[in-house]
């Protein structure tokens, strides 16, 4: 059998309800951001994430380690929520990794290019942001993934996304 972990991409409160009902939850998913105001906009706080982590650990489904959290992030989330307090989006993203690191995640996945041209205008900016996120993930010591994507109204195309994917593979 292949070792597999299941995860439902839903709000953390829904996952807590599933755990309370006895569902077999392996990983708890939640989008996180780098400011308290942005996380509040997501309907979460640190105590809620801690409660979810403890609930998932109580199920004792893992056979190795205590990594039961899966977080998604992305440059621009604090800006789009007007919750950046004048701080640049890369710094806000690095702060999101600090939030995630506290909960010993299995994966922190940046979804670079998802928000659109308001925050990352073109393919060059998507590539830059993806490499910044990868670098900050390494510096922060979080298990980092990168979902390279773009919205159709951006000045980007599939070649930009493939270039970023190759650069990330080379960066390790």
Where do the model's predicted regions map?
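Anaerobic metallocofactor- and corrinoid-dependent redox/one-carbon enzyme cores
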Residues: 1-172
